[in-house]
């Protein structure tokens, strides 16, 4: 608990430092790819600081009519529960992984990136989720990738931008209730926009459920001295789901 409190204080300090963030434009050496190794905390750049560091607004979400009614009903149910101070059940309550692309931004939890020439490993502190990006390997046909929480990711460098192609996400793994089929493809473009500021542009494509691709961008700031905290959800997990699908907490008996 004390370690988590220190993390929260550190995240608050980082958030406040954004106000004074700015300086000259960032330039990257053309001789080699940028080094993304480090621990990165999500934040909303540009608040009182340099607006050029703020991620662009997401594109409009265009869900096909056959899936729209169910999507809107689920989002409305989520909003209604929140207005009552409640939460509807999701996989995380049972300690299931968030999966892709949700794992790239879980509240204020950081993501650690370990970069080598052939593989880039990303570790989300929440739930200790791990994904591996295989660099300069060909992507498999979607039907040849067993469905999983994180899918299969391959990457390549386009100048200073890491382009990642991910397929094979389980249909039950959704980002903000957006429906998808096994044909979904996720494309990421990760790029340093300043020495310690990283943008991850994420595009979700599924010609079955979406009329057009949906794109949003996450922003992170590097935390040079942070040590990742062990996260074991199953240990002392006291959350459960009642008959109405509402998340409840078991109160420990004295």
Segments from the language model and where they lie:
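PEST-like low-complexity, intrinsically disordered acidic/proline/serine-rich tracts
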Residues: 2-3, 12, 23-254
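Sec-dependent signal peptide hydrophobic core
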Residues: 8-16
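Low-complexity, intrinsically disordered segments with a bias for serine/threonine
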Residues: 19-21
């Amino acid at each position: 608990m004390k370690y988590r409190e220190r993390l929260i204080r550190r995240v608050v300090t980082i958030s406040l430092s954004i106000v004074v963030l700015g300086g000259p434009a960032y330039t990257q050496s053309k001789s080699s790819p940028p080094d993304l190794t480090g621990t990165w905390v999500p934040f909303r750049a540009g608040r009182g600081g340099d607006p050029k560091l703020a991620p662009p607004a997401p594109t409009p979400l265009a869900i096909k009519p056959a899936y729209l009614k169910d999507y809107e009903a689920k989002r409305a149910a989520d909003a209604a529960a929140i207005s009552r101070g409640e939460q509807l059940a999701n996989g995380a309550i049972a300690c299931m992984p968030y999966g892709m692309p949700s794992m790239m931004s879980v509240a204020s939890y950081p993501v650690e990136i370990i970069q080598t020439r052939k593989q880039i490993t990303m570790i989300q502190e929440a739930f200790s989720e791990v994904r591996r990006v295989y660099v300069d390997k060909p992507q498999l046909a979607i039907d040849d990738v067993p469905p999983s929480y994180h899918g299969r990711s391959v990457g390549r460098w386009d100048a200073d931008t890491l382009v990642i192609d991910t397929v094979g996400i389980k249909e039950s793994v959704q980002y903000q209730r957006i429906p998808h089929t096994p044909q979904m493809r996720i494309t990421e473009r990760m790029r340093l926009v300043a020495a310690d500021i990283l943008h991850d542009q994420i595009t979700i494509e599924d010609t079955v459920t979406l009329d057009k691709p949906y794109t949003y961008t996450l922003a992170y700031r590097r935390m040079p001295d942070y040590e990742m905290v062990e996260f074991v959800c199953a240990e002392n997990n006291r959350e459960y789901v009642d008959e109405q699908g509402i998340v409840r907490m078991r109160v420990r008996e004295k």
